[in-house]
Amino acid sequence: MQDTWTHRTVLLNEAIAALHINPDGHYIDATFGRGGHSRLLLSQLSPQGRLTAFDKDLDAIAEAQTITDPRFSIRHEGFMHLGQLPAASAAGVLMDLGVSSPQIDNPVRGFSFRSEGPLDMRMDTTRGQSVAEWLADASIETMAEVIREYGEERFAQQVAKAIDRRRQERGPLRTTAELAEVVAGAVKTREPGKDPATRTFQALRIFINAELEELQQALEASLKVLQPGGRLVVISFHSLEDRIVKQFIAGQSREVFDRRAPFAAPKAMRLKALGRIKPSEEEIAANPRSRSAVMRVAERTGVSA
C-alpha cells in the first residue's frame, strides 16, 4: 500500500557509513520500516552482495515487496529472530528502533494521542493483544507497574486508578482520545512542551510489543550472525532502549573474570565499541523527531559467540 504520511529516515547516511560497507557482503536491516536504510545500503552493494530485512509490520512488508532487486529479501518476523540466519554470515546488522512516522501518523494504528483511532498499538496486527484488550482486564497494580517501568511516569498509580475508574463508570477504553483524556485528568504536573499522555502511551506501546525484551534478544542474536569485523549499528530513541544497547555493547567489549574461578582465563571481549553519534543540528531542524536519536556502533571480534 502507498503511505500518505511523510517519513524521513533518521541518521541515514551516518548509519550506512558506520556499517563500513563491503560491496560483496551480506547485510541485515533488522527493522525495515519504510526502507530508507535498506535502499541506500542496496545502492552500495555489488551484484554479489545481499540484504536481508526483518519487520513485524504488515505495512512495512507491503513497502518492502515493492523492491524487486534480487539481492534483497524481507521476512515478516521481529528482529529477535535474526539468529535463525547462518552463524557468522553477516558483514553488518542495522537496527533502527521504536515506532516510525507512518505508524505514529496513521490514526488506525492507535500509536498517537494526537489523533483519534482504535487503541491498538501492535506492531504486528496479526497477533497478540491490543492495548484496549489488555487495559480492559489489567489490574490497577499491573497497569501502574507497566506505566512506571516503561514510561518512567511518576503519576503511574494515579493514571492506573483513573483508567480503572473510567472502566467502572463507562466501560473499557476503546480509542486513543479516550485514553489521552483519562491520562490528562490524572497527571497533575505538566512537563513543558510535552503532552501529559506521552509517557503512558510510550509505556503501553513498549509493553504490548515486548520491545525491550525483543531488543535484548536481537542484540544477543547479532553476536551469532556477525562475522569477525562485522559492524553492529543501533539507533535508539529513548533512554530505556539506549541504556540496554549501551550496557550490552559495554558488557561485550571487556574481558570478564569469573569470581568463582579466579585462576581461569577471562572471557574475551566479543565486541569492540566504536562510539556513538547524534543527529546534526541541520537534521534536527529538518526532522524534529530525530532530536532524541542516539546511534551506537560496535565491531564484532573473532571471539566465538
Swiss-Prot record:
A Pfam family: Methyltransf_5
CC terms in the record's Gene Ontology section: cytoplasm
Binding positions (S-adenosyl-L-methionine): 35-37, 55, 79, 96, 103
InterPro entries on file: RsmH, SAM-dep_MeTrfase_MraW_recog, SAM-dependent_MTases_sf
Localisation per UniProt entry: Cytoplasm
EC code: 2.1.1.199
Keywords assigned: Cytoplasm, Methyltransferase, rRNA processing, S-adenosyl-L-methionine, Transferase
Family per record: Belongs to the methyltransferase superfamily. RsmH family.
Protein name, per record: Ribosomal RNA small subunit methyltransferase H
Organism: Polaromonas sp. (strain JS666 / ATCC BAA-500)
